[in-house]
Amino acid sequence: MATTHLDVCAVVPAAGFGRRMQTECPKQYLSIGNQTILEHSVHALLAHPRVKRVVIAISPGDSRFAQLPLANHPRITVVDGGEERADSVLAGLKAAGDAQWVLVHDAARPCLHQDDLARLLALSETSRTGGILAAPVRDTMKRAEPGKNAIAHTVDRNGLWHALTPQFFPRELLHDCLTRALNEGATITDEASALEYCGFHPQLVEGRADNIKVTRPEDLALAEFYLTRTIHQENT
């Protein structure tokens, strides 16, 4: 598929298991309505006209993905993921073709809104380093004493943000930063942290707080509520 400088490739690392969900089924394959969480997450990306391809990195032993309609979608590419998220993202970047910019989106974050995605993608016109969707911290934050469930002190929440996805960067820059961070043993918790490690300062694009990641059992019902509400709003 031919690409232009405006075209974007999305990478979805989906090789994880998610033990906190307390289920034998990987969380991305749990269902909300008639689709899996992974399908909801990917369809939100495919809905934007600039996203020409989505690369999904799955576990080499994954037998579930082939059973989904996504497996035969013409804009979907599947690659083997790695042991860590960064390894899966790097595998996805290698299959991103000529796209100059890439989105990275959590497989278990199904409630992405199109207006948030559009504002994030607009960074390609104004930024050289990209940025992430994020939500300002609203709750009081506590720091625990080391090794204890006891409060050490209250953390000033001014300037604190919850990092969300998608995260959006120039493809070559993200590749180089992830590679360097992994080679030097840095702790990488998301793609932005790799750029931070290399001295860059990605932008924060405020996104909706209901763009939740399904991590624990109680998140499933909340995500279902948000998705049902969104579908109702779009149909009225």
UniProtKB/Swiss-Prot annotation:
SUPFAM superfamilies from the UniProt entry: Nucleotide-diphospho-sugar transferases
Pathway(s) served: Isoprenoid biosynthesis; isopentenyl diphosphate biosynthesis via DXP pathway; isopentenyl diphosphate from 1-deoxy-D-xylulose 5-phosphate: step 2/6
The protein's Enzyme Commission number: 2.7.7.60
Reaction it catalyzes: 2-C-methyl-D-erythritol 4-phosphate + CTP + H(+) = 4-CDP-2-C-methyl-D-erythritol + diphosphate
Spans through the membrane: none
InterPro entries, per database record: IspD, IspD/TarI, IspD/TarI_cytidylyltransf_bact, ISPD_synthase_CS, Nucleotide-diphossugar_trans
UniProt-annotated site: Positions MEP for the nucleophilic attack, residues: 157, 213
Annotated site residue numbers, Transition state stabilizer: 20, 27
Pfam families referenced in this protein's UniProt entry, alphabetically: IspD
GO MF annotations, alphabetized: 2-C-methyl-D-erythritol 4-phosphate cytidylyltransferase activity
A Gene Ontology BP annotation from the UniProt entry: isopentenyl diphosphate biosynthetic process, methylerythritol 4-phosphate pathway
Top-rank EC class of the record's enzyme: transferase
Keywords: Isoprene biosynthesis, Nucleotidyltransferase, Transferase
Nucleotidyltransferase found in the keyword field: yes
Tagged with keyword Transferase: yes
Assembly notes: Homodimer.
Annotated HAMAP family: IspD
Family membership: Belongs to the IspD/TarI cytidylyltransferase family. IspD subfamily.
Record function comment: Catalyzes the formation of 4-diphosphocytidyl-2-C-methyl-D-erythritol from CTP and 2-C-methyl-D-erythritol 4-phosphate (MEP).
Entry protein name: 2-C-methyl-D-erythritol 4-phosphate cytidylyltransferase
Taxonomic lineage from the root: Bacteria, Pseudomonadati, Pseudomonadota, Gammaproteobacteria, Enterobacterales
